[in-house]
Amino acid sequence: MNSGREPRTPRTLLSIADILAPRMVPRAPSAPQLPESGPGPTSPLCALEELTSKTFRGLDARALQPSEGRAGPDALGPGPFGRKRRKSRTAFTAQQVLELERRFVFQKYLAPSERDGLATRLGLANAQVVTWFQNRRAKLKRDVEEMRADVASLRALSPEVLCSLALPEGAPDPGLCLGPAGPDSRPHLSDEEIQVDD
């Protein structure tokens, strides 16, 4: 009954082997026929087929239905690796964000009692306030680092380039902002440029 090969798992019409293999009609439902020229049981194609079939078998039927605006691996629920499902992203109201930002300007870290009071006042969970402040501190850190990098790159520029960046386009004399050029570094204006109302 067994011709030296391991019994194969049933395949779907979407498996890679079915797509690549020539069309065949099985003779009996209990013993599917495979072409002799097909890949052997130890080929990479068979391994890939086995891996994908195990993966799709492990998925929940409800996980294949569209989730609430989320996509990606976390939307599939607990998988074979025991990952927990992520909580959905909190959409803060404009008033909540305004109050959180206002508090953050004065205080980057909250004491537990202050955090509880703020959460109660805004109608948020304590964990949401904690997470918001953590994310906001991380954003502040990124912004400060980006600003420092910008300042460092500006310091590396020549004064002429800095001047051209500082003046509006079409400015009359770019030489006005070059800094001290001699004993009298103030710009000189001609009589036509000075207007005096009588």
UniProtKB/Swiss-Prot annotation:
Changing residue 139 to E: Found in a patient with atrial septal defects; uncertain significance. The keyword rRNA-binding does not apply. InterPro entries: HD, Homeodomain-like_sf, LBX_TF. It comes from the Eukaryota. Keywords: DNA-binding, Homeobox, Nucleus, Transcription, Transcription regulation. Residues 85-144 bind DNA. GO terms for biological process: muscle cell differentiation; positive regulation of convergent extension involved in gastrulation; positive regulation of non-canonical Wnt signaling pathway; regulation of transcription by RNA polymerase II. It is found in: Nucleus. GO terms for cellular component: chromatin; nucleus. Signal peptide: none annotated. GO terms for molecular function: DNA-binding transcription factor activity, RNA polymerase II-specific; sequence-specific double-stranded DNA binding. Residues 24-46, 63-89, 173-198 are annotated as: Disordered. Transcription factor. This is Transcription factor LBX2. It comes from Homo sapiens. The gene is LBX2.
